[in-house]
UniProtKB/Swiss-Prot annotation, chain B:
Encoding gene (name): snx30
Annotated segments matching region Disordered: 1-66
Membrane-related topology note: Peripheral membrane protein
UniProt subcellular location: Early endosome membrane
Domain PX: 80-201
Keyword set includes Iron-sulfur: no
Compositionally biased tracts (Polar residues): 1-18
Residue ranges of domain BAR in the record: 223-428
Keywords: Endosome, Membrane, Protein transport, Transport
MF (Gene Ontology): phosphatidylinositol binding
Designated name of the protein: Sorting nexin-30
Binding-site positions, a 1,2-diacyl-sn-glycero-3-phospho-(1D-myo-inositol-3-phosphate): 123, 125, 153, 167
Length: 434, 430
């Protein structure tokens, strides 16, 4: 069953995608139906559930699982809407999937997961991971993540991703069988080491700089936004106090009483309206947060490019030093001061046989080195090509998404203003009748 | 000296509340006739023919009274014949002191004034002088409050534009209230204040009231026997009202504080969009647009906050002082009644002598009733003023908030096309 399933995916991922279509996908990269995997199946994270169990060190822990539902698009369009396939996943499994994608597709700006812990919160918003609002926002975020991967021209075809959606039990083993973990470890080590590229690619350097700036500005924006939300909340809620005092005051008035009383109700309504407003604004904040994390993904790609470039440069340097050694050995001259030169002076010349053997060894090493440089060159070129394509795709997606986010933010502000005008008009009518 | 004419016309209206409301509000004539008689005992007879018809006509028509009450806003405006404004504050610096004077302009058709128009300059202490004079010469009346003299030093700059403007508004309100009062507006000190080139502040110093004497009767916690329920109710009302105003004042202050802090965040929030826009290509304009929009909203918010702290709070505080003035009048009334009750008791103790009630006690009774009538009239006038003032104040607050939201709305609505434009164009080329 599992086998035939994995057969299927390979087919799903690759068929029907003519080059022109995939080209189209590169351009039209928004999370929409009609792109790659989403053409075949509907994906949703339908609900979240709290569970309790034992963790690795046998400690009792509470965690949240999310229900992933998939159903073939064809069936849905025919109106038969069968029971969707569904399975439960934990956040940590999403993380595992993303890590796998990061290692396997180093040239892709991998869609980020929603935040692990609530950040940039204002006081009314709970930072508790078990908070229902937080869980709900994360559910939406996880669904968005799946849709983004499913609509990505490269990632959508991944076998492991398909299994993530369809195979609850066997999936984890399959991921580890890919051996990505080992690769991840060595990559991580290499990435953490400090290295300096001699000839950095200007485009990637700029893109990395852009990622830095984007991350800095969006996090600042989110910080100030959270503080402003706190203040706005205060402004509205304090108006609610008018509601009470007007009502009390109305009790000692005759002609003014009715007007005051009803104006008080409008003040109550005004104070209550901020809850919905800020809840909506939180959605905007989540959209910004996605790009805050996207900035990190973008920087990761640039960093991996640097590493690839560095590996190429190291190979080239290695080769040229081998070549230099060969030259020295062949001509017997030592251009620069070296240990070898010293030893030869101290212990006399090597025998011709020895030299011959050394030369031979160097010869093979140079051959290997040349092969290596060639490979690295190809690797680097491919990386640049793939990465740049994906970065272009990402840029377009980003411009589109953020523009949409700004529009919905503006619309939200407009509706808030309209609500404000309405409430104050109502109150004014009451006041003018006093 | 006011015991001659007025008390004779008042007793008949003494216990009937409808008439009492009617009396002060009814017409300028009755008011006009009464004030001279306080000042000029010689003319007291005039009050009789004018006062009596009102008294006899009123008991029948409580409905006509209602009509009058409803109409009185308009009536006031139509019959007003004394217009006073305070404007043009000027700073004077001398070696001795620095102070502000305000121009007081008067337009009137009243014959008590020699000229139809006056323009004089007065400083705060002149206003203060006037208020003391009014309080002394019209002890039975509610004298509107002046803005507080002492402001916390260091916290408020006494010569700042905002402070002077707030004070000017309060002084203007004070004079207008006096000018609209059917009795106070005929006070000679008021006349002098409005018209005299130089205020002779010594003038009228001798005119000390008899009311002052009755203070001694209330010392030692004398308890009134027969304080009419309505006055007790007034006191209770004022206490409650003070409390509510205090709460409203605190709420308004907190809102201003929250708004000010919100404004500070917005001032930081807008520019972040701007710095973001600096390194985006396609998003440059939209982000710049949002930044501008937030900045517009900040300005609108700043205006709202300023309006609230300069127009809303001072009026609230003035009303707290107004209530204090009213409480003072109530206290004075109690004192006058206390004097009467003490004297009456003394007489009752020697009841057996069967002598007629001494005129002294009768005079006292007259004075109590006169005071009651004046107070009730002022109370109703005050209630009416208060209703109008708060209607205006709260409607104004609603208006300011509406304006604020309308400005923000306009800013965000004008942003939408800017956000959409390029996208549509792109959609077409795709």
């Amino acid at each position: 069953m599992a086998d035939s399933g994995s057969e299927d995916i390979a087919v799903i991922g690759n068929t029907d995608l003519t080059p022109s279509e995939s080209q189209n996908n590169l351009k039209n990269t928004m999370v929409e139906k009609g792109t790659s995997l989403l053409k075949k199946m509907e994906i949703s994270v339908a609900e979240a559930e709290k569970r309790t169990g034992k963790n690795a060190v046998n400690m009792q822990e509470t965690y949240t699982v999310y229900l992933i539902e998939t159903r073939p698009v064809d069936a849905a369009s025919e109106g038969t809407s069968p029971v969707p396939d569904s399975l439960w996943r934990r956040y940590s499994e999403f993380e595992l999937l993303r890590n796998y994608l990061l290692v396997t597709y180093p040239f892709v700006v991998v869609p980020p997961l929603p935040e692990k812990r609530a950040e940039f919160v204002w006081h009314k918003l709970s930072a508790d991971n078990m908070d229902p609002d937080f869980v709900e926002r994360r559910r939406v975020g996880l669904e968005n993540f799946l849709l983004r991967v499913a609509s990505h021209p490269v990632l959508a075809r991944d076998n492991i991703f398909y299994l993530f959606l369809t195979e609850e039990k066997a999936w984890k083993e399959t991921v580890f069988e890919t051996g990505f973990q080992a690769k991840a470890d060595s990559r991580l080590k290499a990435l953490n080491a400090t290295f300096r590229v001699k000839n950095p690619d200007k485009r990637f350097a700029e893109m990395k700089h852009y990622g830095d700036e984007l991350q800095a500005v969006v996090s600042q924006l989110l910080r100030v936004r959270a503080r402003a939300a706190d203040r706005l909340y205060g402004v509205y809620k304090v108006h609610g106090n008018y509601g009470r005092v007007f009502s009390e005051w109305s009790a000692i008035e005759k002609e003014m009483g009715d007007g005051l009383q009803s104006a008080g109700h409008h003040m109550d309504a005004y104070a209550a309206s901020i809850d919905d407003i800020l809840e909506e604004e939180e959605h905007y904040a989540d959209q910004l947060k996605e790009y805050l994390f996207y900035a990190d993904a973008l920087r990761a790609v640039c960093r991996k490019h640097e590493l690839t470039q560095y590996e190429l440069e190291t190979a080239v340097q290695d080769l040229s030093s081998k070549k230099q050694q060969r030259e020295e050995l062949a001509t017997g001259t030592v251009r620069t001061f070296s240990l070898k030169g010293m030893t030869s002076k101290l212990f006399g010349q090597e025998t011709p046989e020895q030299r011959e053997a050394k030369l031979k060894m160097l010869e093979t090493q140079i051959e290997e080195g040349e092969e290596m440089v060639k490979d690295r060159n190809v690797e680097c070129e491919e990386f640049v090509k793939g990465a740049w394509t994906d970065i272009e795709r990402f840029k377009e997606q980003k411009d589109h998404d953020l523009r949409e986010a700004l529009i919905s933010y503006a619309i939200m502000q407009i509706s808030m203003c309209k609500k404000g005008i309405q409430v104050w008009n109502n109150a004014k009518e009451c006041f003018s009748k006093m | 000296m006011s015991n001659g004419g007025t008390p004779r016309s008042l007793p008949s209206s003494g216990q009937k509340s409808i008439q009492e409301i009617c009396h002060p509000l009814s017409a300028e004539e009755s008011a006009r006739s009464r004030s001279p008689d306080v000042l000029n005992p010689g003319e007291k007879d005039l009050s009789l023919p004018n006062g009596t018809p009102v008294d006899t006509s009123s008991p029948a028509s409580s409905s006509s009274l209602l009509n009058r009450l409803q109409l009185d806003d308009d009536l006031d405006a139509e019959t007003r014949d004394l217009f006073v404004t305070v404007d043009d504050p000027k700073k004077h610096v001398s070696t001795m002191e620095t102070y502000i004077t305000y121009r007081v302009c008067t337009k009137t058709t009243r014959t008590e004034f020699d000229l139809p128009e006056y323009s004089v300059r007065r400083r705060y202490q002149d206003f203060d002088w006037l208020r003391i004079k009014l309080e002394d010469s019209q002890p039975t009346h509610l004298i509107p409050p002046l803005p507080e003299k002492f402001v916390m030093k260091g916290v408020v700059d006494r010569f700042s534009e905002e402070f002077v403007e707030t004070r000017r508004k309060a002084l203007d309100k004070f004079l207008k209230r006096v000018a609209d009062h059917p009795v106070l507006s005929f006070n000679e000190h008021f006349n002098a204040f409005l018209s005299a080139k130089d205020l002779n502040k010594r003038q009228g110093l001798a005119l000390l009231t008899k009311m002052g004497e009755s203070v001694k009767y209330v010392t030692g916690g004398y308890k009134l026997r027969g304080r009419p329920v309505e006055f007790a109710a007034m006191g209770e009302y004022l206490d409650m009202f003070t409390q509510k105003l205090g709460t409203i004042d605190r709420i308004a202050q907190r809102i201003i504080k929250e708004q000010t802090e919100f404004l500070m965040e917005l001032r930081e929030y807008g520019p972040v969009y701007s710095s973001w826009s600096s390194f985006e290509e396609d998003l440059h304009e939209p982000l710049e647009g949002v930044s501008g929009c937030v900045s517009n909203c900040s300005s609108a918010l700043e205006e709202l906050t300023e309006d609230m702290s300069e127009d809303f709070l001072p009026v609230l505080r003035e009303y707290v002082l107004y209530i204090e003035s009213m409480k003072n009048v109530l206290k004075k009334r109690d004192q006058v009644q206390a004097e009467y009750e003490t004297k009456l008791e003394a007489v009752v103790f020697r009841e057996d002598k069967k002598t007629p009630m001494p005129t002294d006690v009768e005079k006292c009774q007259d004075r109590v009733e006169c005071f009651n009538a004046d107070l009730k009239a002022d109370w109703d006038r005050w209630q009416n003023n208060k209703r109008q003032d708060f209607r205006q104040l709260l409607t104004g607050m609603a208006d300011k908030n509406i304006q604020y939201y309308e400005k923000c709305l306009a800013a965000w609505e004008s942003l939408i096309p800017l956000l959409q434009d390029k996208q549509d164009a792109k959609g077409e080329t795709n």
